[in-house]
Amino acid sequence: MEFTESASLCWYTVHVRSRHEFKVLDRLTKAGIDAFLPAVERLSRWKDRKKLISFPLFPGYLFVHIRKMYEDMLTVLKTHGVVRFISLIPGEPEPVPEEQIMSLKIVLENKETVDPYPYLKEGQRVKIKKGPLAGAHGLLVKRESQHMLVLSVDILRQGISVKVDASDVETL
């Protein structure tokens, strides 16, 4: 792995132990690492009660915003619960495009209803031009006579979908 002294900050995907996403997020934050765990709230029901519970949108994964430097990567890897960085080439962590992280944050901050969506590479790339999701980029697809914006995280081969009005989007 090549390391540079003046490396800029990039987002990387980290694989974590099963059901340890929130604990690892807390540990990374306490270590001074900028970490992002896309999560959604779902209503869980038991026999005697109902409660809103936060669930990771991509179970087993979270994102870290670090420099591609030995010290930063080692700090992340030494964090209890972290398994490895996701990479296409062994030993070479694959950066996640800033646009994909920002689009996820825009959708999640606006409390839109999201559904996990299978990974898609082909399709029309669009940007939402107005409304609460303005600025989010993704793929426009049609499902059951409704238009959906699909935000894909390429490195994970996963994505999410959110309902949009087709008139609110423009092609890139």
Regions found by a protein language model. Give the residues of each.
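Acidic-enriched and Gly/Ser
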Residues: 1-127, 145, 150-151, 155-172
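Short, charged beta-turn/beta-strand-edge "cap" motif at the junction between a beta-strand
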Residues: 131-134
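Short beta-strand-centered aromatic/proline hotspots
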Residues: 136-141
